[in-house]
Design a protein with these regions (language model features):
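Cytoplasmic helix-loop-helix junction between adjacent transmembrane helices
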Residues: 97-135
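Paired small-residue
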Residues: 6, 81-84, 92-101, 291-299
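C-terminal transmembrane helical hairpin of 12-TM major facilitator-type secondary transporters
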Residues: 267-311
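C-terminal membrane-cytosol helix-exit motif in multi-pass small-molecule transporters
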Residues: 164-184, 372-376
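Helix-to-loop junctions at the C-terminal end of transmembrane segments
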Residues: 54-66, 253-265, 349-350
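Juxtamembrane intracellular "pre-TM" segments in multi-pass secondary transporters
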Residues: 178-209
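Conserved MFS/SLC helix-loop-helix module at the cytosolic interface between two early adjacent transmembrane helices
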Residues: 53-92
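Helix-breaking motifs and short loop linkers at transmembrane-helix boundaries and internal kinks
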Residues: 34, 66, 87-93, 233, ...
Length: 410
């Protein structure tokens, strides 16, 4: 694989870390700024909503520009946002830093996917894209636990300083290692042609499933530090190691979910969302039992991220004419789900329903996502059957209308 892919993955690692590590540091950040848990939760919701704006707005704005300079500019934006977060002295400067960093998120992964695919032969494109997204997976498996540990040991600001350094390293790597021609073999289309791909009803159903399917897990994950310490009885110092368990489940689920989706996307998503709903409900019921909590964490990460490859593949399948914008839009949809889950979980805590209530809220969102996915799958099956029926009828009519072969006497 080209070394430029490592630079792309490093950028993905930094972006994934800045998105997810805040969950483990939320109690420390809330205490430092003197705000409630729900108010601190907006550092996650605000980030997620800004990702949506960047995924759609920035990606649409740069579809006709050279991709390597755009990626570099996005990382400069990412670095600036994390630098502001690391130095923020109050709630709102921190929020502004989160928003600035988030604007680069969706566009980076959307455009980066095209660049990664352009660096390798056609037979290796999927592997190249997967390698770039390995940075995001590694951020959850290793970055979040150790970023949380660093924040607890040296203060949460130290984690954001570290993320800033990672961003600088990724920027240097992209400038030095990514070829200027990468991703230019497929010329960017006009914004009108990219938007035209969104006329498909299945694209919109897929985006709704992404929002609900991913939002359910984030309803539980956003306030997981509170659940682990206040309900399960774990010491705050053990939270980073428990997040390793979550990350290992995530890595395993992401890998196996991709293989299952290669065989049948719709069936995989319906089954995985159904199992995730059950896992979340069992987690809410057994959160007071430490051993069962550890098992639930692994399963929540596994089944939560087993949806990701299928959700991304489904949107791309039904929007083949919009490779850049569809990819960015689905990244935005993941983060709408992130914001929805975080907001609803915070609302249940504010209502005095306790620290397991975000998990129940997540289960409800996931069940809704499963229902939409089942509807979308059934609709797709009906359309496929109808298309085969029409095709067969046209073929039969053509054969009937053809004249009999004329036999020439010898």
């Amino acid at each position: 694989m080209p070394v430029g892919l490592i630079a792309l993955a490093l950028g993905g690692f930094g972006i994934g870390l800045t998105e997810f590590v805040i969950a483990g540091l939320l109690p420390d950040v809330a205490a430092d700024f003197g705000v409630t848990e729900a108010s601190a939760g907006w550092f996650i919701s605000g980030y997620a909503l800004a990702v949506v704006v960047g995924a759609l707005g920035l990606t649409a704005a740069v579809t006709r520009l050279e991709r390597k300079p755009v990626l570099a500019a996005l990382l400069v934006l990412f670095i600036a946002g994390n630098l502001l977060s690391a130095t923020a002295g109050d709630y709102w400067p921190m929020m502004l830093g989160r928003i600035i960093a988030a604007l680069s998120h969706g566009a980076y992964f959307g455009i980066g996917s095209v660049v990664a695919a352009g660096m390798v032969p056609p037979s290796r494109k999927a592997g190249a894209i997967a390698l770039m997204f390995t940075g995001l997976t590694a951020a959850n498996v290793l970055g979040v636990p150790f970023g949380t540990l660093l924040g607890q040991a040296a203060g949460w600001r130290a984690t954001f300083w570290a993320i800033t350094v990672i961003g600088v390293a990724a920027l240097a790597g992209i400038l030095a290692l990514v070829p200027k021609s990468a991703g230019t073999s497929s010329a960017p289309g006009s914004l009108r042609s990219e938007l035209g791909a969104f006329r498909s009803g299945q694209v919109w159903l897929s985006i709704v499933v992404t929002i609900l399917g991913f939002g359910g897990m984030f309803g539980a994950f956003t306030y997981i530090a509170y659940t682990l310490t206040e309900v399960s009885g774990f010491a705050a110092s053990t939270v980073p190691w428990l997040l390793v368990v979550f990350g290992l489940g995530l890595f395993t689920g992401n890998t196996l979910g991709g293989k299952a989706a290669d065989r049948n996307i719709d069936r995989t998503l319906v089954v995985v969302l159904a199992i995730l709903s059950v896992v979340l409900m069992v987690f809410a019921l057994t959160a007071a039992h430490p051993v069962l909590t550890v098992v639930s964490l692994a399963l929540m990460g596994g089944f939560g991220f087993a949806t990701v490859p299928g959700l991304q593949m489904r949107v791309m399948k039904y929007a083949p004419g919009a490779p850049t914008l569809a990819s960015g839009a689905n990244i935005g949809a993941f983060n709408v789900g992130n914001a929805l889950g975080a907001w609803l979980g915070g609302a249940t805590i504010t209502a005095g329903l306790g620290y397991t209530s975000p998990i129940w809220a997540g289960a409800a969102i996931t069940i809704a996502g499963m229902a939409v996915m089942a509807f979308a799958a059934a609709k797709a099956r009906r359309s496929a059957v109808m298309a085969r029926t029409v095709s067969g009828a046209v073929g039969s009519a053509a054969r009937s209308a053809a004249p009999d072969a004329v036999r020439v006497p010898r």
